[in-house]
Amino acid sequence: MATKQKEVTTFDVQVAEFIRNHKQKGTATDDEINASLVIPFTLDADGIEDLLQRIQDAGISITDNEGNPSARVLSNEEEPELSDEDLIGSTSAKVNDPVRMYLKEIGVVPLLTNEEEKELALAVEAGDIEAKQRLAEANLRLVVSIAKRYVGRGMQFLDLIQEGNMGLMKAVDKFDYSKGFKFSTYATWWIRQAITRAIADQARTIRIPVHMVETINKLVREQRNLLQELGQDPTPEQIAERMDMTPDKVREILKIAQEPVSLETPIGEEDDSHLGDFIEDEVIENPVDYTTRIVLREQLDEILDTLTDREENVLRLRFGLDDGKMRTLEDVGKVFNVTRERIRQIEAKALRKLRQPSRSKPLRDFIED
């Protein structure tokens, strides 16, 4: 187990370093992946598939040496089956008016037959702008179908669709029908890459290192697999066993993966309140305490004003009433150039005066509270 743990850790470190080195460029070639990871760690087919998924989840596009989508990735690409449900309420995304209007608008565009798709692709290669627009519009619902998979990752549904549409336009520009892939399969790759990269770059308010993002994505995948296998949410111990790490490490990753909640999140059925309205500000003083303190200070100043100037100043210095710093009898004696015993006598006399009911009555409410 220890040896296996070490091997897994070494592999994860290398994957994290590979992702870190390719994150800014946003792409990695098949040859680079083979040389750095597949061959050194002798990965089998399942290992390669998992590796490619981790790299793509980090927002890195996998290409051939010419910059086109990797044939290995395209062959494994799961093409969504489109239906009218993609344009109505089957998504867990909150469908508000702008989303509903957009879905209604693209729903009237008919899907293309294989022959129409081929004709349009050839026309696009020939520079036909109208064909380019028609090919893109006919696949807008494909973007919606893919975007639905990424709801809840930190970006609004419409933003996911917008990023996916940008990927769709790249697919239209770069598609080569002679390679033998359907346009929808080719476009799925570009759409998914555009969305996953946008999520990695934009979604989180609190920035998480790239290597941790891909670790979180792997954990989430294993969590979902275990949920399907067990029929219930897996425990950290079960996830840890599957991922060859400690339960404490799993808990740490789950904690990091938590999404921050906006203080502007609406609360209540009418959305007239926000989460921030119910969270106490521990830095700003409570309004009640602030008001009480101000009134107490005013009352205390009025009472001290009934003493002689020397008595008042002695009490202010002794108890730090002005600056919060209490002073010894000796310190106060130096200020007035008298002995500490004389200061003690002045203090005692002043306190006796303050205990008189006529003076102490205004402060009793504060003392009782």
From Swiss-Prot:
Its main location: cytoplasm. Residues 76-85 have a biased composition (Acidic residues). One of its GO terms (cellular component) is cytoplasm. The keyword Acyltransferase does not apply. A motif (Interaction with polymerase core subunit RpoC) lies at residues 159-162. Sigma factors are initiation factors that promote the attachment of RNA polymerase to specific initiation sites and are then released. This sigma factor is the primary sigma factor during exponential growth. This is RNA polymerase sigma factor SigA. It comes from Streptococcus pneumoniae serotype 4 (strain ATCC BAA-334 / TIGR4).
